[in-house]
């Protein structure tokens, strides 16, 4: 999981103390309740028919939280990027030290629509602000061994543990703005997690539909490019193998460096171990709307067994803020949404190129409710995602060929790679890279 910690210095209205979060209303608590995985809504909690001893036990179980000094006086957003199928673990932070020790049980809520949250932040907590809902598990407990169908990706499973919210088998349904609260903290809510799934692009340059179905967990029979919800099932990260970086770190006597590739340098990509930026170009995009694709690196991990690691992935970014006078063709209108996100410090460097939010913009749907692109919206909009990533390839790889899908040896091979499937089929797959160094 790639976690980028950034601070948002902007003003949000505090949640009103009487704020009630939306709930499915089907959860009940009684003396016969054996499992309570997440704290239910306040009404259900207050009216639950349980003994004082059991209530005291559950309150202690859900009361743990942690103090975050950075959000005591300003709102903080923390983007969390994850791959579907991962378990996501986020810590319950309170922005006031007294709230950590008040003994109140902590619950979790979510604003499902990230765009509404960012657009209406100043009205958050009022009737005109974005709607928040309690984090609850699905009423139906699904067979974890059953294969999810294309139409049903499978609901994630939530539980609270030791001051954390854990999301098992996170997927596009987990996308949203999450926050931890208790009855005393709702009037000073200033710490939010923005959970966004990473859905790498996938494409087979063939009409072998059976092969596509096999490789996408029966999730697509399309010859279009599409976001892959099951990337983790059959793919892995690409090692960072830049020869010049290896020599710079280890010296010319390190023979393993000679097995690495010599990555081409060009303007704004003089050292891919630091950053790599390339302008996105397309005939229908106005020249004064600068978009870039950037290879960005996470911070180095702590030293473990004399090794540090970090990950690199491609981000898409507007190089300047748009204003009302900027004219955008209809197929580029989604850039307004990217522009809204980049107004916030947490997204000043853009967003990952392969993310579920961007995919929904390109398909012109509110959210991705299926992994079959044919189910996502009007047929007239199905080509939006395919066309955009075709343009991305043209911008990043000048020697890309349609037949055989060949890539150049520039640093963006760490974001999009090819994979030979059999004698007749090659696949184009979005990916990311991992870098290692001795410490």
From Swiss-Prot:
The superkingdom listed in its UniProt entry is Eukaryota
Protein name, per record: Uncharacterized protein F22D3.4
């Amino acid at each position: 999981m790639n976690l980028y910690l950034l601070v948002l210095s902007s003003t949000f209205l505090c949640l009103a103390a009487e704020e009630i979060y939306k709930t499915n209303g089907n959860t009940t608590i009684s003396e016969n309740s054996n499992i309570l995985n997440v704290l239910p809504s306040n009404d259900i909690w207050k009216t639950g028919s349980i003994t004082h001893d059991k209530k005291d036990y559950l309150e202690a179980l859900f009361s743990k939280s942690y103090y975050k000094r950075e959000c005591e006086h300003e709102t903080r957003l923390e983007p969390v990027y994850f791959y579907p199928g991962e378990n996501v673990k986020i810590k319950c932070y309170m922005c006031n030290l007294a709230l950590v020790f008040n003994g109140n049980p902590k619950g979790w809520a979510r604003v499902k629509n990230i765009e509404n949250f960012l657009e209406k932040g100043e009205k958050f907590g009022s009737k005109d602000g974005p709607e928040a809902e309690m984090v609850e598990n699905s009423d139906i407990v699904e067979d974890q061994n059953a294969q999810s169908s294309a139409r049903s990706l499978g609901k994630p499973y939530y539980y609270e543990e030791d001051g954390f919210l854990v999301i098992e088998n996170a997927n596009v349904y987990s996308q949203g703005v999450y926050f931890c609260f208790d009855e005393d903290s709702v009037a000073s809510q200033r710490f939010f997690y923005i959970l966004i799934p990473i859905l790498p692009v996938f494409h087979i340059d063939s009409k072998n539909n059976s092969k596509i179905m096999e490789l996408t967990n029966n999730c697509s029979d399309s010859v279009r490019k599409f976001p892959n919800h099951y990337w983790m099932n059959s793919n892995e990260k690409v090692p960072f193998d830049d020869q010049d970086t290896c020599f710079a770190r280890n010296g010319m006597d390190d023979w393993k460096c000679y097995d690495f590739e010599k990555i081409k340098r060009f303007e704004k990509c003089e050292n891919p171990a630091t950053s790599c930026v390339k302008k996105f170009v397309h005939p229908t995009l106005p020249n004064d709307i600068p978009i870039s694709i950037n290879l960005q690196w996470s911070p180095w991990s702590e030293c473990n067994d004399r090794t540090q690691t970090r990950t690199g992935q491609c981000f898409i970014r507007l190089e300047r803020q748009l204003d009302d006078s900027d004219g955008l063709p209809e197929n580029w209108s989604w850039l307004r949404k990217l522009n809204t996100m980049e107004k916030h410090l947490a997204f000043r460097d853009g967003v990952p190129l392969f993310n579920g939010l961007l995919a929904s913009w390109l398909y012109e749907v509110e959210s991705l409710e299926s992994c079959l692109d044919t189910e996502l919206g009007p047929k007239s909009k199905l080509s939006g995602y395919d066309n955009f990533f075709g343009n991305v390839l043209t911008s990043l790889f000048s020697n890309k060929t349609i037949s055989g899908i060949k890539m150049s040896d520039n640093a963006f091979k760490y974001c999009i790679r090819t994979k030979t499937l059999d004698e007749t089929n090659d696949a184009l797959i979005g990916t990311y890279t991992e870098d290692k160094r001795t410490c």
